[in-house]
């Protein structure tokens, strides 16, 4: 395949980062060209987003939605709107797992994901959801090759 098809994958693990919730101060990109004037790890993510064409949300399900750590980062996407900054992201996907057997427990996170994709104008490449995951690392028992996703 030509080099144009080679991809670099960067993992940004919000669970191990310090990202404060958005304060809606509307001072985005006003200081040192940083996405958020409150200097936390979101600025690192914003820099990565400014160079990415795809974003994949990979997260456990917490109470029918995104966990706080990734939700804080998603809320700060607001900075790109206020700062009138375009990101080259064109496509997105959701990967999630949850403890309960009922597949409907994913309805909330899937709908939130769909609305994010619609709002940002990203092509929704779908979702891959795994229920009945009861222990740390349990998701990997169900994982298929990325060709299947």
Question: What does each model-found stretch correspond to?
Answer:
Residues 2-80, 118, 124, 137-149:
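N-terminal beta1-alpha1-beta2 submodule of the flavodoxin-like/Rossmannoid cofactor-binding fold
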Residues 131-135:
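Active-site rim beta-loop-alpha module in soluble metabolic enzymes
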Residues 5, 129-130:
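Short acidic (Asp/Glu) and glycine-rich catalytic loops that position anionic groups and cofactors
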Residues 68-69, 83-127:
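Short, glycine-/small-residue-rich phosphate/pyrophosphate-handling segment
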Residues 14, 97, 130:
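Active-site donor-binding loop signature of nucleotide-sugar glycosyltransferases
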């Amino acid at each position: 395949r030509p080099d144009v098809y080679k991809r670099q994958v960067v993992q940004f693990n919000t669970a191990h980062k310090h990202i404060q919730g958005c304060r809606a101060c509307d001072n985005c990109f006003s200081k040192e060209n940083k996405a958020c004037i409150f200097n936390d790890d979101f600025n690192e993510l914003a820099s990565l987003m400014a160079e990415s064409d795809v974003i994949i949300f990979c997260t456990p399900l917490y109470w029918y939605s995104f966990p706080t750590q990734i939700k804080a980062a998603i809320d700060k996407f607001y900075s790109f709107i206020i700062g009138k900054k375009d990101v080259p992201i064109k496509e997105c996907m959701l990967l999630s797992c949850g403890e309960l057997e009922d597949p409907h427990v994913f309805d909330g996170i899937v709908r939130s994901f769909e609305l994010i994709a619609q709002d940002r104008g990203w092509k929704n490449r779908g979702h891959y959801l795994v229920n009945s995951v009861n222990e740390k690392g349990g998701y990997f028992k169900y994982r298929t090759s990325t060709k299947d996703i």
